Regions:
Chain B
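Structured domain cores in non-transmembrane regions
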Residues: 48-111
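Short amphipathic, basic-aromatic surface patches that mediate peripheral association
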Residues: 24-35
């Protein structure tokens, strides 16, 4: 719901908001420039002295104005010709032209009304309103994503566009809120929607009738410092009924032109002060530094517009059209999707198609539409639940748990929950788990035990599909490819073989970099940009789901390297480990930004076993200055010590600080978790120093490592979960 | 065609016999190319003693800017009721404004003066930009303003 309040104003007012922000940012420079350029009055200068100086220089002076920037301007009449100049308060002489610059005027016209008069003003006010709605809904979205306003500046994960969008927003939103609220106030004032704020005092009924007092003699003016002056208007020459008009930051008054007496005075009303403050906050006139900051924040708007559209497009692309979707009242299978970015819909579409082909009637809808009383012919309910942030319901599942709580369980319609998530997050499938517990507590029968799909894994999904097929008595083979990958051909350069003696035939395969088109190089698509830890996907010949391998090299290394262990009966691993130099495979690249060492100089603790050494070796090869401690588990050092010679070189070059190996084949089997226990003191010390832990390998090993670290860290009050939440403990598990 | 009668009836200042006799008068104002935003112009009449009688036209719709039309604002206290129904758009730099009104015959050759106050955003205010006596002889004779008005004349 909130997302809709963010998306539609954002898309509809995209151009308008961007234009407002850019012109506003450009205008924000002027008050500061004016303040720097204008000759400033000394602190003790009185209006009387200033007026005397100006009158001496320009005897026909009519008005002296002081801008909030401190710039003093005089207007005069000389032999029938009007003149004006910026005044140096020290001399009373003009030093520069008083007319505002063409550029500033043009920008102001654009910013305020697109040069379209009142219609343009209304359009720009609508733009400001859109900006306000975007800011408020954006705050709500960021708070939801980070788990509350308290976590406003928490670390972000995910694709660059989304991160950039939020990183900029959470700084710029303060300025954008201020600018849009003040803009709407000013627009309301322009269109007379605000109450009148009161004006000058009534002109005095009687004046002395005398003329000719020098401004320097007027007591009120001698007591008024120039820093408080707004405007001093001189009486009309030859009109004895006129008077001096003085406006200061306190109010407005009239001074007798014969006696200098203060004839009338009105303080600024609260409304006027409010208006002036809002004008200052919006324009930066009188608050140049604030203006510059607001301008800088406004510059974030075009970037947020671009990344916002990119996010919207990618979410749209991720949500496929579902053909032959049955109405909920007619379908045997109700498939409900709780998805945030839209990727889970793709899985639903795949299942919908497979079930429909098998002769089933299927309805696919968002989890937020859950209404079991309308499911007239349903035999089962399937729930695909992603998780948002720290366990919250994703966008399309908003309100689901409430609806579930209110609904009466239908014993004849069992339910199955499949969670979608990313194991490297602490709240893995937390929402799916919440749904499962809630359904269980309400007494819904479970069609299948709850299951999960990690990082859109096609394998996980296919496995669950087979279980579902078995339960339904249908052969169900789900082949889902989240994004149709664009493959490129890789040619094998060299291979090194290990592990045959310990029944773990493993090869380090090094491929040549594929040629990149100019467009790919510009956009960083395909293999034009990758780093160790990213994944390459290889499609098996039978069209099943692709197998993913972690990259052991980055683009700068000039080659594509992976470590593959041959699995008995594994189609892809068999094909890969049978490759000879010169032969080719087709592969696609999938970025894995969550598994990178990141910048900084904090120590790294790399933990891997078997082929899990691959990305870790890539990190070591690219390391320059960081202390790195590698825990490497193998079967036997004489057989599957992958990267043996390189590791020795890296140690000699200072890329690797310390190597701890664990050997599992021997008299006393030793695993990486044992090695961690043995080095508990140093591990604790490193983590206290801010070390980042990166784990790569099989799922059992990763679980063992987490357990070992939990025990090791317990005395220091830290837990792996805390490290994960802080982004200091990441896993790449298969 | 706007009628001054209704407007002047709002003010107590002008209760002359023979007011019913009126004729169309065209006020033609051409602005200098001063190169700024649209100018606000207040057209109003004072009597022989200089007292405000009534307004004829207001070019410029946003009342929050009226205080910059200094003399008019001082005379009326910024009362927008003075220009209700006789308000039009502001006049762009170098542009011409023609307004035709039914003016009472009694306003002519009786010591009344027509004033125009002008103001432009971010530029100097120009109260009393024009001050011409309303006389039958003066009709059709162009006068120049102090800053913004290149020429002004009224034709009967």
């Amino acid at each position: 719901m909130i997302r809709a309040f963010h998306r539609w104003p954002g898309l509809l007012a995209l151009a308008l908001v961007t234009l407002l922000a850019l012109s506003g940012a450009a205008l924000s420079v002027f008050p500061a420039a004016e303040q720097l350029a204008a000759p400033q009055a000394s602190a003790d200068l009185s209006v009387a002295t200033l007026a005397g100086r100006v009158q001496a220089a320009y005897p026909g002076v009519e008005q002296i104005r002081r801008a909030p920037s401190g710039r003093v301007t005089a207007y005069w009449f000389d032999q029938g010709t009007p003149g004006a100049a910026v005044i140096d308060p020290a001399t009373g002489q003009g030093v520069a032209s008083a007319d505002p610059g063409q550029v500033q005027r043009w920008l102001t016209g654009l910013h305020r009304s697109l040069f379209l008069g009142d219609g343009g003003r209304l359009a720009m006010a609508a733009g400001a309103a859109a900006m306000l709605v975007l800011s408020l809904s954006g705050v709500a979205l960021v708070a939801r994503r980070t788990g509350g306003l308290r976590h406003w500046f928490t670390r972000l994960r995910g694709p660059l566009a989304g991160r950039l969008h939020v990183e900029i927003a959470r700084i710029a939103v303060a300025g954008l809120l201020l600018s849009s609220v003040t803009a709407l106030w000013m627009a309301a004032s322009t269109f007379g929607l605000l109450p009148e704020t009161g004006g000058a005092p009534a002109f005095p009924a009687a004046v002395s009738g005398q003329t000719g007092i020098a401004p320097a003699q007027i007591v009120t003016l001698t007591q008024t410092p120039v820093s408080t002056l707004r405007e001093l208007s001189f009486p009309y020459p030859g009109d004895a009924t006129d008077a001096f008009t003085l406006k200061t930051d306190r109010g407005t008054g009239y001074l007798d032109q014969g006696t200098g007496a203060l004839l009338a005075w009105a303080d600024l009303t609260a409304g006027q002060r409010m208006s002036e403050t809002i004008y200052m906050l919006h324009t930066g006139q009188g608050a140049a530094l604030l203006g510059l900051m607001l301008g800088l924040m406004a510059l974030g708007v075009p970037v947020m517009a671009g990344t916002g559209v990119a996010l919207w497009l990618s979410a749209r692309r991720g949500r496929p059209r579902i053909r032959d979707n049955q109405p909920a009242s007619q379908a045997e299978t109700i498939l409900l999707v709780g998805s945030e970015a839209g990727s889970t819909w793709g899985f639903a579409a795949t299942l919908h198609e497979a079930l429909t082909r098998a002769g089933q009637t299927v309805h696919v809808g968002p989890m937020s539409d859950f209404a079991p009383e309308t499911y007239g012919r349903a035999r089962r309910i399937l729930l695909f639940a992603a998780t948002y942030g720290d366990g919250a319901a994703p966008a399309s599942a908003a309100g689901f748990l409430d609806r579930l709580e209110r609904a009466t369980p239908l014993p004849e319609i069992p339910m199955a929950v499949l969670g979608f998530g990313d194991r490297s997050f602490p709240a893995y499938c937390a929402f799916a788990n919440a749904v499962t517990s809630a359904a269980c507590a309400k007494g819904w029968e479970a069609l299948l035990p709850p299951d999960t799909v990690d990082r859109q894994s096609p394998q996980d999904f296919a496995r669950w599909g087979r279980a579902l097929g078995q339960r339904l008595g249908l052969p169900l083979e789900l082949s889902h490819q989240p994004v149709a990958p664009r493959t490129q051909t890789l040619t094998l350069l060299s291979r090194r073989d290990y592990g045959a003696e310990v029944q773990a035939p493993t090869a380090i395969l090094r491929f040549a970099l594929p040629r990149q088109s100019l467009w790919q190089r510009l956009t960083g698509a395909g293999f034009a940009r990758f780093s160790a830890g990213d994944l390459i996907g290889i499609l098996p010949d039978d069209g099943a789901a692709p197998r993913l391998y972690s990259l052991a090299s980055g683009r700068r290394d000039g080659f594509v390297e992976i470590v593959v262990r041959k699995h008995p009966g594994g189609l892809v691993s068999s094909r890969l480990t049978a490759l000879h130099p010169g032969e080719t495979i087709t592969a696609f690249l999938r970025p894995n930004p969550g598994f990178r060492p990141g910048r900084g100089k904090a120590p790294l603790i790399l933990i891997g076993a078997g082929t899990g050494i691959g990305p870790l070796a890539g990190f070591l090869r690219a390391n320059r200055r960081r202390p790195v401690h590698l825990f490497f588990g193998m079967r036997h050092p004489d057989s599957d010590f992958l990267y043996h010679s390189e590791i020795a070189d890296w140690q000699a070059q200072g890329r690797l600080t310390r190597l701890v190996t664990a050997v599992s084949r021997g008299v006393k089997p030793h695993y990486v978790q044992d090695a961690l226990h043995a080095e508990a003191a140093q591990v604790t010390q490193l983590i206290r120093e801010g070390a980042r832990v990166m784990v790569c390998g099989g799922r059992d090993m990763a679980a063992g490592v987490t357990e070992a670290l939990a025990e090791i860290l317990a005395p220091s009050g830290l837990t792996p979960a805390m490290l994960k939440a802080g982004g200091r403990y990441v896993e790449d598990v298969y | 065609m706007k009628s001054l009668l209704a407007t002047l009836a709002l003010t107590t200042a002008l209760t002359l016999p023979g007011l019913a006799l009126a004729k169309p008068v065209t006020l033609s104002t051409t602005l200098n190319a001063y190169g700024g935003e649209g100018a606000y112009l207040a057209y109003y009449v004072t009597d022989a003693s200089g007292a405000y009688v009534g307004s004829l036209w207001m070019a410029g719709g946003k009342s929050k800017y009226y205080e910059h039309l200094g003399d008019w604002y001082r005379a009326t206290g910024g009362d927008t009721a003075q220009v209700n129904g006789i308000t039009g758009a502001s006049v762009g730099s170098g542009r011409k404004l023609d307004v035709t009104l039914d003016l009472a015959d009694a306003l002519f050759d009786a010591g009344y003066t027509l004033h125009i106050d002008a103001a432009v955003e971010d530029m100097r205010d120009s109260p009393n930009e024009i001050a011409v006596p309303l006389t039958t002889d003066g009709a059709g004779k162009a006068v120049q303003g102090r800053r913004y008005i290149a020429s002004f004349q009224y034709d009967m």
